[in-house]
């Protein structure tokens, strides 16, 4: 039996993907059956971190070492990730959500529809307020765009109003939100998005 929802979490290195996965797990683990697959190029660092901080029980977390280009492992040849997801689904047949965190990649990264049902794409304010208008599949076509680290805007000279305008223009009707995952600001918007996807999922 497959999980009700396979949710990809992608974005550049350091944008806050692992922080988002941890926050989702901590907030929803008491009401949903969750599991996580992380991707790193040469290590299992993110999986080890999530285990160390107790985001979920260790047996619900899988680390995938992609080698080479992390984009390939979630798009062109996602077999290693699909195997990890299917293994979790066999071990936990009542899973509601499997979160698949990509390795850090560029704005062109996107998940194969064979691997995930929906994708959250995470960027951060520290990369500059021009990022939303640069476009790319993550910016324009992800199911939810998360603009993280809003607390750093003043420190890096980023204008949140510019980012708001550009994100709205680039995404049209697709949702997006600001977050500061360190403090939890904006997390409710992400959780609400995730929960809204579940009731209509096929069993």
UniProtKB/Swiss-Prot annotation:
How this chain assembles, per its entry, is: Homodimer. UreD, UreF and UreG form a complex that acts as a GTP-hydrolysis-dependent molecular chaperone, activating the urease apoprotein by helping to assemble the nickel containing metallocenter of UreC. The UreE protein probably delivers the nickel.
Q: Does the keyword GTP-binding apply?
A: yes
- Name of the coding gene: ureG
- CDD domains from the UniProt entry: UreG
Q: Which organism is it from?
A: Prochlorococcus marinus (strain MIT 9303)
Protein name according to UniProt: Urease accessory protein UreG
In the record, biological process GO terms are: urea catabolic process
Any idea what job this protein has?
A: Facilitates the functional incorporation of the urease nickel metallocenter. This process requires GTP hydrolysis, probably effectuated by UreG.
Places the protein is found? Cytoplasm
The family this protein is said to belong to:
Belongs to the SIMIBI class G3E GTPase family. UreG subfamily.
GO terms under cellular component? cytoplasm
Out of the domains of life, which is the source?
A: Bacteria
Which UniProt keywords are present, listed alphabetically? Chaperone, Cytoplasm, GTP-binding, Nickel insertion, Nucleotide-binding
Q: Does the keyword Nucleotide-binding apply?
A: yes
Where GTP binds, per the record, is at 11-18
A molecular function (GO) term:
GTPase activity
